[in-house]
Each structure stands twice: as structure tokens, then as C-alpha cells.
Curated annotation (Swiss-Prot):
Belongs to the globin family. Red blood cells. GO terms for cellular component: blood microparticle; haptoglobin-hemoglobin complex; hemoglobin complex. It comes from Liparis tunicatus (Kelp snailfish). This is Hemoglobin subunit beta-1. GO terms for molecular function: haptoglobin binding; heme binding; metal ion binding; organic acid binding; oxygen binding; oxygen carrier activity; peroxidase activity. Keywords: Heme, Iron, Metal-binding, Oxygen transport, Transport. The lineage of its organism: Eukaryota, Metazoa, Chordata, Craniata, Vertebrata.
Length: 147
């Protein structure tokens, strides 16, 4: 079980209360697909992913980015039970979708960059540490079903 300080709990909740999922989610997911193009192989049904402009303007990318944010919101609401919270998603991604679990870390890194750009000076080292701790536990939880 992960130990969360009061500061970490409040910071994580505050970050997710402040950010606009409809902007941050699509931006983070698009960044992941652009920076790490091999991640595109899981999204062949998304249509045009041929270049950065196409990815950024793709409504399927935007929709999935928002879905990711709502998935993370579930974790924010269940900080003490993240492994259980993400058990079904872990099974889905490992057994049905066969997603490389390293991709979860890639999207978390992209999300950190986008959140930092949105929060500006408020994204201090302490805030970053809390967010990255949360994302690391989510990544671990999503990878739990992989053998």
C-alpha cells in the first residue's frame, strides 16, 4: 500500500480539479502519439494519424484523451485502492488489447508535460513530485496483470 501525505493527497486532487480534461487529455494523448509514433499501432481504427497536425485534429484522439483523464479521475477518488481501481483496465489492456505496459509510462510523462504547461509557475517541484508519484502508482496498477 502506498503512503500518501496530506500534501500529496490535496495536491493531486487540486491538480485534477483545476485542469480542463477536454484540453489536457487530448493534448497529452496527441503528444504521446507524436513523440512516440510506435504507440500509434494500437489505434489503427482512429483514421488519419499520418502527421502531427492530423493527430492533433483527430476527434478519436481527442475522445480517447478525455477517456484517459476520466480514468485517472477514478484513481484520484480512490487513492488508497489504486490497484483495485485499475484491475479491470489492467486485464483489458493486457489480455484483450495486448498493449505494451511501457506505454502507460509514456502517456504519464506526456501528461506531466501538459499539466506543467497549463499550471505554469504553480507547477513547483513539490507539485510535480506528487503528480508523478500518483502517475507511477497508476502505471504500476495498470501493469499489474501483465506476466
Amino acid at each position: 500500500m502506498v503512503h500518501w501525505t496530506d500534501f500529496e493527497r490535496s495536491t493531486i486532487k487540486d491538480i485534477f480539479a483545476k485542469i480542463d480534461y477536454d484540453c489536457v487529455g487530448p493534448a497529452a494523448f496527441a503528444r504521446c502519439l507524436i513523440v512516440y509514433p510506435w504507440t500509434q499501432r494500437y489505434f489503427g481504427n482512429f483514421g488519419n494519424l499520418f502527421n502531427a497536425a492530423a493527430i492533433i485534429g483527430n476527434p478519436n484522439v481527442a475522445k480517447h484523451g478525455i477517456t484517459i483523464m476520466h480514468g485517472l479521475e477514478r484513481g484520484v477518488k480512490n487513492l488508497d485502492h489504486l490497484t483495485e481501481t485499475y484491475e479491470e483496465l489492467s486485464v483489458l489492456h493486457s489480455e484483450k488489447l495486448h498493449v505494451d505496459p511501457d506505454n502507460f509510462k509514456l502517456i504519464s510523462d506526456c501528461l506531466t508535460i501538459v499539466v506543467a504547461s497549463r499550471l505554469g509557475k504553480a507547477f513547483t517541484g513539490e507539485v510535480q513530485a506528487a503528480l508523478q508519484k500518483f502517475l507511477a502508482v497508476v502505471v504500476f496498477s495498470l501493469g499489474k496483470q501483465y506476466h
